[in-house]
Amino acid sequence: VARRRFDVSSVHERRRALRSELTAGRRLVGTFVKLANADIVEMAAAAGFQFVVVDLEHSTLTEVDALGLVRHADAGGVPALVRVPAVDPPLIARLLENGAVGIQLSMLRTAEQARRLMAATHFAPSGERSVSLANRVAGFGATSLRDFLQLEAEAPPLLVGQIETGIAEPWPDVLHGLDVAFVGTTDLSVNLGLPSIGELSAAVERVRLAAEAAGVAFGGWSASLSAAPAQGLAEAGYLVVGSDLQILAAGLRAALSPEGGN
């Protein structure tokens, strides 16, 4: 019986494409997905967002929800990263096996956190991730172990570290192995004691300069594309704009305002 060819996930192609854009200094714009509805992923892509970040930190999404969103994004060719609140190797492995292009880690403070993130997302000898071919990214076994390991070595997951506190350790050590140093301005402001706009801007600039010196892309979150420069994100190559919840809530409020809803 002739076997029907199975088109495996093209997640490695999407990783290469995103990394190429970041390396070339071209801006990528995405949004957070906090609702367990696959239509959100499609709407984001149709609106022109270049990637989505499925949010397992500030949302009610379960792991099952996140896996469903990642698989839907993968099947539709939409690059999907997943934001996680901590390095959880088994969870990270399942997310990557189902088509996540990368992992975005909240509250990155230390070089040890960065090392554990690298270990959880890379196979030996550069990491400690457990290997399985029984998943969509490996074609459920249609890809050989040797070929799969080569694909992963050539196009590893994108790694984004969120800088949301003061950093006491040397920046190069904390940012080692990352693709993006992502400044979380809200948590950074709170952790710095709600500083003045000037003081916060200086803190954001320190992250940008550290990213530049370490050879990684600079990124951050903004409520809108137009608001990014005022937050010190004019040069952000990896920009996450709003979220599905934020955009929906703003639209609902606008629909009830005398000037909105047209």
Feature locations, PLM:
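N-terminal amphipathic alpha-helix/helix-capping segment at the start of soluble metabolic enzymes
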Residues: 2-30, 142-155, 206, 212-213
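Hydrophobic faces of well-ordered beta-strands that scaffold small-molecule active sites
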Residues: 28-33, 52-54, 80-84, 103-105, ...
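Active-site beta-loop-alpha junctions enriched in small/polar residues
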Residues: 34-36, 57-59, 85-87, 108, ...
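Glycine-rich, proline-tolerant flexible connector loops at the mouths of alpha/beta enzymes
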Residues: 40-68, 183-199
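Catalytic cores of alpha/beta
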Residues: 42, 46, 87-101, 105, ...
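Alpha-helix-loop-beta-strand connector modules within alpha/beta enzyme cores
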Residues: 63-97, 119-127, 151-154, 196-220
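C-terminal helical cap(s) of enzyme catalytic domains, especially alpha/beta-barrels
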Residues: 69, 73, 111-127, 245-262
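Conserved anion-binding
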Residues: 90, 100-180, 185-190
